[in-house]
Amino acid sequence: MNILLINGPNLNLLGTREPEIYGSKTLNDIENDLSSIANDKIINLECFQSNHEGEIVDKIQDSIKNVQGILINAGAFTHTSISIRDALIGSKIPFVELHISNIFSREEFRKESFLTDKAIGIISGFGISSYSLGLYGIIEYLKNKK
């Protein structure tokens, strides 16, 4: 089973960017933690981060034939990107939407997501644990889908 983790803009700054909201772990720390979980479950996990919308769309499209599930924290693109939404829909790859903070308890503009209604699930507000919860969730979903 192949799972793709996508992180959007500014998530490369985790560990230094607003640690009171996002915590002190770096993106590399998160990816290492998830890779350990994936290895224990005999899952192939590919991690990808980009600050560029088109690169994220390209990555989704390039994954159509070899990825069974996607975890995505689209960052600010969650609230703005119809092209990422369309790429996810067009790929037909099941995906879980992730957020470190609870986007529904923040500023008004963060409460709208272009992804939520197409995701198999959303995990928001559990800090860095949102990533591992999402990974466990998509693994179970894919196992039960077979």
Curated annotation (Swiss-Prot):
It holds the Pfam family DHquinase_II. SUPFAM superfamilies: Type II 3-dehydroquinate dehydratase. The keyword Amino-acid biosynthesis applies. Pathway: Metabolic intermediate biosynthesis; chorismate biosynthesis; chorismate from D-erythrose 4-phosphate and phosphoenolpyruvate: step 3/7. It catalyses: 3-dehydroquinate = 3-dehydroshikimate + H2O. The record marks 17 as: Transition state stabilizer. InterPro entries: DHquinase_II, DHquinase_II_CS, DHquinase_II_sf. The active site is at 22 (proton acceptor), 99 (proton donor). One of its GO terms (molecular function) is 3-dehydroquinate dehydratase activity. One of its GO terms (biological process) is aromatic amino acid family biosynthetic process. Transmembrane segments: none annotated. It comes from the Bacteria. Keywords: Amino-acid biosynthesis, Aromatic amino acid biosynthesis, Lyase. Catalyzes a trans-dehydration via an enolate intermediate. Belongs to the type-II 3-dehydroquinase family. Homododecamer. This is 3-dehydroquinate dehydratase. It comes from Prochlorococcus marinus (strain MIT 9515).
